Amino acid sequence: MHKLAHISFGIVGMFVNTCMVAKYVIINWEMYSMKKVNNDTVFGILQLETLLGDINSIFSEIESEYKMSREEILILLTLWQKGSMTLKEMDRFVEVKPYKRTRTYNNLVELEWIYKERPVDDERTVIIHFNEKLQQEKVELLNFISDAIASRATAMQNSLNAIIAV
């Protein structure tokens, strides 16, 4: 019996040790998993800044080449998509700081991208139109923007995938 008890205690001891090892492995795996999840989450959230940097660099490249601000580019893109509209209507699509508003639209007029019209019946309203004479320049600008996006497409897609995985 003594030998059997010794074997039983040995088996119980091994079982306890195995359970302790298993518990240790599980705890460490959970900590590793949490750390990995936390690291992946942090990385994904940080990719917001990376993606924003890529987007800002596209606008900077456009600004450098075409001497137009981000707001001016967005105004043109909105006009091309939605058509002519009042300045008040445009405010719903493109946010322009009040202190920059007049200068922004006047710059587009000076560059001849747009022209303004005041209806006869309401002198307070200003309607802006794309200057159709610049159709070729429009195509060139759109191609330039498309190329700028394409050159960063993989990096932006990777950032977006990491963000979505959060």
Swiss-Prot record:
Q: A single GO BP annotation from the record?
A: response to stress
Q: What SMART domains would the database entry show?
A: HTH_MARR
Pfam family of the protein (one): Staph_reg_Sar_Rot
Tell me which UniProt keywords the record has, alphabetically: Activator, DNA-binding, Repressor, Transcription, Transcription regulation, Virulence
Q: Does the keyword Cell membrane apply?
A: no
- DNA-binding region range list: 87-110
Q: Which residues form the signal peptide?
A: none
Q: Repressor as a keyword? A: yes
This entry's Gene Ontology molecular function terms read: DNA binding; DNA-binding transcription factor activity
Give the function comment from the record: Global regulator with both positive and negative effects that mediates modulation of several genes involved in virulence. Also, modulates the expression of genes not previously implicated in pathogenesis.
Q: Which family does it belong to?
A: Belongs to the rot family.
Report the protein name in the record.
HTH-type transcriptional regulator rot
Protein source organism:
Staphylococcus aureus (strain MRSA252)
Q: What is the lineage of its organism?
A: Bacteria, Bacillati, Bacillota, Bacilli, Bacillales
